[in-house]
Amino acid sequence: LKDHPDMDMVPRTFIFGAKAAAGYKRAKLTIKLINSVADVINNDKSIGGKLKVVFIEDYRVSNAEIIFAAADVSEQISTASKEASGTGNMKFMLNGALTLGTMDGANVEIVEEVGAENAFIFGMSSDEVIAHEKNRDYQPMDIFNNDQEIRRVLMQLVNGFYAPDDPERFRDIYDSLLNTKSSDRADTYFILKDFRSYAEAHKKIDQAYRDSSWWAKAVSYTHLRAH
């Protein structure tokens, strides 16, 4: 949007809701980053209201009940093979939200119920992830060096774009994506590897949402198959 302010896109709001365990420093830092991103985006008038970011503090059942009912899209984006099956995606499904996700956890069962044509699936399969881990052949730095957009986004983590008062605030997140430290492999969850596929899924959502007839049918079918 900054590069192409006249871009035709369906306005959207990304809603995050989570809690971090008391000693989970990276999770707390991630929440801090989400809020910093929200501050930048939500106060940028040049975006023209096309994009907003919201973080729900003190996420709990009473918050979730509102979000489940309001969401058009349920993002379930754990890396394939990494997530134990949860129930949040099922609650979104019961309320008719279409799933954007990987083939992981309960997403697999949801896609089996609604059909791949009524969901937006992206990313590597579990077998592909496991193969990369076994072969130890994934090099996120190659993506950083060859994808200008991803490189710019990551550099914003350490150049003060989101933290002018402390440019190094998000260094740990940056390092976790690019630098291997002892037993911690860089980009353990293949975030950079899956990103382009994720971005393409969002383009498909943008196109699908414009077809109100198709979207209504997909929502109705998703809701019915949840019962």
Where are these regions (language model features)?
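Long, K/E/R/D-enriched contiguous segments that form extended
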Residues: 1-64
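Short linear capping/connector segments at secondary-structure termini
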Residues: 17, 218-219
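Short flexible/disordered coil segments
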Residues: 38-45, 74, 80-83
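Short, flexible loop segments at the rims of nucleotide/cofactor-binding pockets, characterized by
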Residues: 52-54, 76-79
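Catalytic binding pocket for nucleotide-activated donors in carbohydrate/polymer assembly enzymes
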Residues: 69-70, 77-217
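Conserved small/polar residues in nucleotide/adenosyl-binding loops
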Residues: 222-227
